[in-house]
Amino acid sequence: GEETYMNWKKTAALVLASVFILGGCSEKREQAQQMLAQAKEENRHEATTFAMDTIMTFTVYHEDGEQIMTDAEQEIRRLERLLSVTMEDSEIAQLNANAGKQAVPVSEDTMYLLKTAKEMDELTNGCYDMTISPVVKAWGFTEEEHHVPTQAELDALMPLVDNDSVILSEEDQTAYLAKEGMAVDLGGIAKGYTSDAVTKLMKEEGVESALIWLGGNISAIGNKPDGNPWKIAVENPLNTEDYVGLVEV
């Protein structure tokens, strides 16, 4: 009857009101998300530097982004001064210069990477060997004067490729290369380690969204400001202007 009809009208009115309220909430939520993304975009900071023989770029979303990127670059420079094979006063350069002569003191960072490199040599059955440096140098890769060494040159250098002759003393915090002419090069893992260190630093400084690109070593913090994952293009080695795929991180 009439009472049932009135109850139905009240119910319909409540349902419609709920729809409008929910719709309004949804719209406001979307607006709030857009405003948040815009605010984060305004806090976007970018920087490019050259270190460890490669170009490095940072994209950081944080109100103190400029200072954070300065701190990140200082950390990179600190590690470069320890691990570089080309800087004459680096710990690695000093270790190489004293091969077959004496042990040299090293920092915790350098000791950790030397230990890791020795472990990787064992895990890969010698496929990764930091003592390959004299052979790499013979090809001219480190001096931009590429040439093909003779078999006699390579045969003379191969005895220096000897991971077991890298002697580490954690007690004394020293490293020693047992054969004169030996040299180590941590280039295969140093930038990855540096990327991890920079990522840790940025997180400690409150960064929740960033992309760190150290040559071919890429690290991401959180997602992009709009909530989507970072997309990394994998370069086509046969055509550097093209890519073979995308990886979401």
Task: Name the predicted role of every residue range.
Residues 2, 7-249:
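Mature catalytic core of soluble alpha/beta enzymes
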